């Protein structure tokens, strides 16, 4: 999208109108500057436009697509649990990749289970439940819905922003640790755990915990993750199982 006079309108231009094809959002009375900047960024984000074209519920879908392109954990036949699944973009990707709809002839058919505190609009091929994953018995409920253990537990959750980076970092690390604890209870040996975390220095204990429980732990910032964001994703593969992990001091780290 462009703004102002179009190039080639018949008059010479100073070039100032052509230096930037980004959409500019005028500040409206009553709208905070932060809201204006967020809206401008959304309107100019190629991933936002692509998500609309391709039918995904948000740009975050491309983060899990890019992670799976690299680490190949969403395979046909896999059983996937998406924690904090709203608005549903990660579930949409998982449905397609694990063949949950069974539309890939000759491929195994997977399962996708999404849980969230809030109601989520139905997603073809996914089973969505309203659940607080921190509640007592949530792990057993998830296994009951799946009819067994999961191959993948993934989370794009983030705690509500406090406006203070240090506080937000601590909150999301605690959230990832809680999600990992549920993953330990529901994953099959060899399974994968994927979660978003904000960089900030307090994640060392969480990383050590994952290394004790998984054979490989990687820290990744996919291309779809905004460059000015402190978010990254931890991809932990090769779950050892509850018994094996207790005797392991360190796992293998594939990069920060």
Curated annotation (Swiss-Prot):
Task: Identify one Gene Ontology CC term for this UniProt entry.
Answer: cytoplasm
Location in the cell:
Cytoplasm
Molecular-function GO term, any one: rRNA (uridine-2'-O-)-methyltransferase activity
**Region Disordered, annotated ranges:** 1-20, 219-256
Question: What is this enzyme's class at the first EC digit?
Answer: transferase
Report the domain of life of the source organism. Answer: Bacteria
In this chain, composition skew of type Acidic residues spans: 246-256
Which reaction does this enzyme catalyse, per its entry?
uridine(2552) in 23S rRNA + S-adenosyl-L-methionine = 2'-O-methyluridine(2552) in 23S rRNA + S-adenosyl-L-homocysteine + H(+)
Q: What Pfam families would the database entry show?
A: FtsJ (PF01728)
UniProt entry tagged with the keyword S-adenosyl-L-methionine? yes
Positions annotated as active site in the UniProt record: 196 (proton acceptor)
Annotated coiled-coil positions are none
The UniProt keyword set, sorted, is: Cytoplasm, Methyltransferase, rRNA processing, S-adenosyl-L-methionine, Transferase
In short, the EC number is 2.1.1.166
The residues that the entry says bind S-adenosyl-L-methionine are 88, 90, 116, 132, 156
Task: Work out whether the entry's keyword set contains Metal-binding.
Answer: no
**Functional description taken from the UniProt entry:** Specifically methylates the uridine in position 2552 of 23S rRNA at the 2'-O position of the ribose in the fully assembled 50S ribosomal subunit.
What is stated as this protein's family in its record? Belongs to the class I-like SAM-binding methyltransferase superfamily. RNA methyltransferase RlmE family.
Protein name (database record): Ribosomal RNA large subunit methyltransferase E
- Organism source for this protein? Paracoccus denitrificans (strain Pd 1222)
What does the record give as the organism's lineage? Bacteria, Pseudomonadati, Pseudomonadota, Alphaproteobacteria, Rhodobacterales
Gene that this polypeptide is encoded by: rlmE
């Amino acid at each position: 999208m462009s703004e102002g006079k179009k190039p080639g309108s018949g008059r010479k231009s100073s070039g100032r109108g052509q230096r930037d094809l980004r959409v500019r959002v005028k500040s409206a009375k009553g709208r905070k500057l932060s809201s204006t900047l967020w809206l401008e960024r959304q309107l100019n984000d190629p991933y936002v436009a692509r998500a609309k074209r391709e039918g995904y519920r948000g740009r975050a879908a491309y983060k899990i697509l890019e992670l799976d392109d690299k680490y190949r954990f969403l395979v046909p036949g896999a059983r996937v649990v998406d924690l904090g699944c709203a608005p549903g973009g990660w579930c949409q990707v998982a449905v397609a990749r694990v063949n949950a709809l069974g539309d890939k002839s000759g491929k195994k058919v997977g399962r996708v289970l999404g849980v969230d505190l809030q109601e989520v609009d139905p997603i073809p091929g996914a089973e969505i439940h309203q659940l607080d994953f921190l509640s007592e018995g949530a792990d057993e409920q998830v296994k009951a819905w799946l009819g067994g253990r999961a191959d993948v537990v993934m989370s794009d959750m983030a705690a509500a922003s406090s406006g203070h980076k240090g506080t937000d970092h601590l909150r999301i690390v605690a959230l990832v640790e809680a999600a990992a604890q549920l993953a330990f209870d529901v994953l099959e040996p060899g399974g994968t755990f994927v979660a978003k975390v904000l960089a900030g220095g307090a994640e060392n204990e969480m990383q050590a915990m994952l290394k004790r429980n998984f054979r490989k732990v990687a820290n990744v910032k996919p291309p779809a993750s905004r460059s000015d964001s402190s978010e990254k994703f931890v991809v932990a593969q090769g779950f050892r199982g509850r018994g094996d992990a207790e005797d392991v001091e360190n796992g293998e780290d594939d990069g920060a």
